Amino acid sequence: MFEFVDPEAGFTSSVIRDPRRFVGRADLIQNCMNALNAREGVIAVYGKRGVGKSSLLRQLQQMANGNYDIAQKAGLLHLVPAKPRRYYTVYYACDSNINNTDELIKRLCNDTDPEDGLLRLVPDAGKELAEFSRSDETSAGLDLKLVKWGVKGADSQKYASVVPNDTIQSFRNFVTSSVDANNRLWSKRDAVLVLLDEFDVIVTKQGMGSLIKSLTSPTVKFGVCGIGQDLGALIKDHKSVGRLIEQGAIHVKPMSPAETRAIFTTAEELFKHKVSFEKGVVDQIVEISEGFPYFAQLIGKASVQYGNEIGTNDIDKKIFNEVLDKIRSGQSFPNLEQQYQLAVGRSDERAMLLVLLAEQKGEATLYNDELGRVVLQRTRSTAQGMGIQYIDQLMPRLVEERYGPALVKGEDRGIYEFADPVFRAYVKLRKLD
């Protein structure tokens, strides 16, 4: 009997924080455990879009706070130390409005998020705000000028102070004082862990590596996460933290087929077995999603939504083919469809060229980073055979920033890469109008 179900109960396109929803990645979880329990070091989580970096970072944060449920789920509980290092954690998702290191540090020092913000580490008990004022737009000074704290029976001490016109030193004061300050009030933890997600979007990251190196100690640890095929793409001056990052470099690659299948067995459990996916359907989604959990989650969610619309909880081949028809016609995924329309414009020829590039077979093996690269020359003869005559006039829109871009130029002439590999997988599905 059909029962309406919330698609979000089993599938989500958001960052996964709940360990029960997290699937696979046992090797990466083990790497995270090793990095967290190292006395010193920097953690760097990097990889392509859509592979689940932010979700992994949130699992790392859970373990840093002392919750090792994800390790138990991954069968790694025997590797958890008798006394694992515990952290006060700060999490901040960067955005493209942050131009440089100084602006990032200013954001961190003014973040009042109750769960993840740096300022929440100022103890509430006995907290005194000595001065608060708005800085001039041209000043590098921060809004928070001085915070004092103290508990009855203890000396009132200066917790953290902002040095006018010196954002970096102000940040140093905050992070180096936070562990001692909070250990006076709560059960003791070993260090503070500052996690910077989407670190790659910061325009100029020069100097961040040396700042991280100078602050890293047994009581202060940093973790950065973002898009990049190597550490150099994520941290420009990564050589300054080379020794510290050795154990904490965590490269997130596309999922194996078995891990992608586990997304659907996990979803069925979360749906309390009210929803079922035929094995052949799951196999097809595994192939279509190409190891990107974000895309697999989107397709799963769309399937359950369509099941609700027609009154069924059983996603078989017939139902899934109807779901695919909606995806191929651009009705299911508004964000990916918007990317597609922006890239091709009103040109049928450009749409055909984009599909040819997306479908180009790579020489590298599957689940290898080289897979994303396409060679324009390999597509020319096929494109011309389909009547696409002016390829060089069609390409600029595909690489221009204002239209996406759909493609980014490689180091060698005529070599390109899809900026978003999930978008590439979508283009392969999308039928030409």
Where are these regions (language model features)?
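A short, basic N-terminal segment
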Residues: M1-Y46, Q62-L76, V80-R85, D433
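C-terminal leucine-rich, beta-strand-based interaction scaffolds used for sensing/assembly
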Residues: P7-A9, R328-D433
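Glycine/serine-rich loop-strand microenvironments at binding/catalytic pocket rims
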Residues: V23-V51, I212, T216-P218, G345-L353, ...
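A conditional alpha-helix N-cap/helix-loop micro-motif detector
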Residues: G24-A26, I168, T204-K205, E278
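Short, conserved phosphate/pyrophosphate- and ester-handling motifs at nucleotide-, phospho-/glycolipid
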Residues: R25, S54, F292, D420
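P-loop NTPase nucleotide-binding core
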Residues: E40-V194, D200-V203, V220, S381, ...
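An amphipathic alpha-helix signature
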Residues: T101-C109, P257, R261-T265, V282, ...
